């Protein structure tokens, strides 16, 4: 059976949202805004939010900071997963992962296909776990 198992009680979690971009600011971070709105609408808490430059060391530093925070349960990022030279978000996240959730990227691309067609092939979406944070 597909979908959400209604027999399992809902547990709200604290989520940090990272936008990876050299050009976005708080005033025009539409992707980050959308993530934050959907997280809140789903009943979770946006615990922290940051715009991080397309620089692997900066991404890793912020990610490690959030993973070390005892109240942050998950990190969701947007940006930097394409195939251009500046797209290094997956490499930064892989540097930090203790375990990769290998099926996440496949599921993400499958769901994205319905919206953007074959352009989904350009996404290198990834998921993993580090320090008990997803």
Give the residues covered by each predicted segment.
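Non-catalytic beta/alpha edge segments that cap or flank active sites
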Residues: 1-134
């Amino acid at each position: 059976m597909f979908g959400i198992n209604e027999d399992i009680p809902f547990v709200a979690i604290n989520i940090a949202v990272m936008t990876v971009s050299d050009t976005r600011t708080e005033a025009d971070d539409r992707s980050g805004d959308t993530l934050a709105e959907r997280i809140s609408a789903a009943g979770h808490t946006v615990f922290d939010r940051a715009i991080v430059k397309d620089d692997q060391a900066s991404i890793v530093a912020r990610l490690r900071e959030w993973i070390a925070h005892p109240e942050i349960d998950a990190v969701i990022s947007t940006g930097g997963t394409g195939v251009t030279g500046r797209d290094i978000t997956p490499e930064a996240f892989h540097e930090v992962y203790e375990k990769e959730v290998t099926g996440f990227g496949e599921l993400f691309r499958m769901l994205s296909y319905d919206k953007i067609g074959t352009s989904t092939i350009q996404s290198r979406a990834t998921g993993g776990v580090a320090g008990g944070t997803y």
